Amino acid sequence: MPTINQLIASPRVLQKSRKKVPALQQSPQKRGVCTRVYTTTPKKPNSALRKVAKVRLTNGFEVIGYIPGEGHNLQEHSVVMIRGGRVKDLPGVRYHILRGVLDTQGVKNRKQRRSKYGAKRPK
């Protein structure tokens, strides 16, 4: 516990809260260009090949975004839209790539939860 004199010399400083998605800069989404599309393996109890892409955003940030759903058409120089939302078992992946927007196609044969994967309503 500081003394009164110590508090006069240097007042208490509020701790700044850490932002979860700094690259978005308060925007709901940001556009970017894929610089690398690859697969990576998740943390310990899980096992898979998760599809991710390194994306250079319009504000200059370079982030890693997760590509949700089965199958994708992304490659280098694809223009994508990114939203916040981390992937718990992939360290460093704090963003999701939106399906069915810009160069990213929606998921084929998706019947449920279609809006999350940019899939049109089946006939």
UniProtKB/Swiss-Prot annotation:
<comment type="function">
    <text>Interacts with and stabilizes bases of the 16S rRNA that are involved in tRNA selection in the A site and with the mRNA backbone. Located at the interface of the 30S and 50S subunits, it traverses the body of the 30S subunit contacting proteins on the other side and probably holding the rRNA structure together. The combined cluster of proteins S8, S12 and S17 appears to hold together the shoulder and platform of the 30S subunit.</text>
</comment>
<comment type="similarity">
    <text>Belongs to the universal ribosomal protein uS12 family.</text>
</comment>
<protein>
    <recommendedName>
        <fullName>Small ribosomal subunit protein uS12</fullName>
    </recommendedName>
</protein>
<dbReference type="InterPro" id="IPR012340">
    <property type="entry name" value="NA-bd_OB-fold"/>
</dbReference>
<dbReference type="Pfam" id="PF00164">
    <property type="entry name" value="Ribosom_S12_S23"/>
</dbReference>
<comment type="function">
    <text>With S4 and S5 plays an important role in translational accuracy.</text>
</comment>
<dbReference type="InterPro" id="IPR006032">
    <property type="entry name" value="Ribosomal_uS12"/>
</dbReference>
<keyword id="KW-0699">rRNA-binding</keyword>
<dbReference type="GO" id="GO:0019843">
    <property type="term" value="F:rRNA binding"/>
</dbReference>
<comment type="subunit">
    <text>Part of the 30S ribosomal subunit. Contacts proteins S8 and S17. May interact with IF1 in the 30S initiation complex.</text>
</comment>
<feature type="modified residue" description="3-methylthioaspartic acid">
    <location>
        <position position="89"/>
    </location>
</feature>
<dbReference type="InterPro" id="IPR005679">
    <property type="entry name" value="Ribosomal_uS12_bac"/>
</dbReference>
<keyword id="KW-0820">tRNA-binding</keyword>
<keyword id="KW-0694">RNA-binding</keyword>
<keyword id="KW-0689">Ribosomal protein</keyword>
<keyword id="KW-0687">Ribonucleoprotein</keyword>
<keyword id="KW-0488">Methylation</keyword>
<dbReference type="GO" id="GO:0000049">
    <property type="term" value="F:tRNA binding"/>
</dbReference>
<dbReference type="GO" id="GO:0003735">
    <property type="term" value="F:structural constituent of ribosome"/>
</dbReference>
<dbReference type="GO" id="GO:0015935">
    <property type="term" value="C:small ribosomal subunit"/>
</dbReference>
<dbReference type="GO" id="GO:0006412">
    <property type="term" value="P:translation"/>
</dbReference>
